[in-house]
């Protein structure tokens, strides 16, 4: 299965928000033009590293920086041999949790930690709806929940995400607007993309219900794996991930480790 960044849907999304996308042999190459300097060329979790194509595009778009986030340690070693260096600041999560969705709903629930089970059972009557057709309301609740503390995507970006992924996107939110999350699906994998919870939602543990609903819905539309899109990684310590990690680990699953971000400058 391909990473979501290598799907046609994701390519369509980035092309709508200011990136140039070249797609060759089912690999997405993302180009961001920078005035006066040239451009940045980014390749994220490709099935293989096609260095001849990368060189061709770097020359075509006058790339002063090439960023590659490989899938395997073998690909990472290959990049190092070509002069790429491991960045201390990864773009994509380098460590994540995944759940096997080919299991039954009952088996998935059984593998949850005690606190997750308890929160989900207590929240059985919480109203959760897909706000895909009211993104302004969804974003408004998100903005109100986090204030200036965290980045909230522009409404146009959320609309582009919906347009690109169509029925493979979910914008779930509780009826009281205290918690919500975006879930995306691509090539058999469902992703816990972005989320928000206000103080009331945290006190009621409503994000547990949101995630559980998201898991069930992406499973229903055919996803075989659920990806939490990042947990704390000791190799690239970022304390802001610790709280999210405790929450995500309460859903069980298994860890998946990625090599990191490799960069080469051509200035």
PLM regions: where:
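A conserved beta-strand-loop-helix scaffold within acyl/acetyltransferase catalytic domains
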Residues: 1-37, 82-202, 217
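Short catalytic/ligand-binding loop motif for oxyanion handling, primarily in non-cytosolic enzymes
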Residues: 37-39, 74-77, 234-236
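STAS-typified acidic loop motif
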Residues: 39-49
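Short beta-strand segments
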Residues: 42-44, 65-70, 194, 225-230
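Non-catalytic accessory segments adjacent to catalytic cores
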Residues: 49-96
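Short amphipathic alpha-helical segments and helix-helix/interface helices
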Residues: 51-58, 76, 120, 158-162, ...
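Aromatic (often tryptophan-rich) hydrophobic motifs at membrane interfaces
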Residues: 55-57, 167-267
């Amino acid at each position: 299965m391909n990473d979501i960044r290598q799907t046609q849907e994701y390519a369509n999304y980035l092309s709508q928000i200011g990136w140039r996308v070249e797609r060759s042999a089912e690999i997405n190459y993302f180009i961001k033009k920078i005035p006066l300097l040239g451009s940045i060329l980014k390749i994220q979790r490709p099935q293989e590293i096609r260095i001849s194509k990368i060189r061709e595009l770097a020359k075509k778009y006058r790339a002063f920086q090439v960023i590659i986030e490989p899938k395997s340690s073998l690909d990472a070693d290959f990049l190092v041999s070509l002069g790429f260096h491991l960045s201390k600041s990864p773009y994509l999560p380098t460590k994540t949790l995944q759940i096997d969705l080919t299991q039954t709903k009952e088996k998935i629930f059984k593998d949850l930690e005690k606190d997750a089970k308890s929160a989900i059972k207590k929240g059985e009557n919480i109203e959760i709806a897909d706000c895909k057709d009211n993104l302004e309301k969804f974003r408004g609740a998100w903005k109100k929940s986090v204030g200036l503390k965290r980045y909230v995507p522009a409404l146009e970006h959320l609309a582009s995400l919906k347009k690109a992924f169509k029925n493979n996107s979910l914008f779930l939110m509780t009826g009281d607007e205290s918690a919500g999350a975006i879930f995306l699906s691509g090539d058999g994998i469902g992703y816990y993309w972005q989320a928000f919870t206000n103080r009331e939602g945290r006190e009621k543990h409503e994000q547990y219900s949101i995630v559980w609903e998201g898991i069930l819905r992406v499973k229903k539309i055919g996803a075989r794996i659920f990806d939490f899109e990042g947990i704390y990684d000791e190799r690239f310590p970022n304390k802001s991930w610790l709280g999210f990690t405790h929450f995500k680990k309460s859903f069980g699953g298994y860890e998946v480790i990625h090599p990191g971000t490799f960069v080469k400058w051509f200035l």
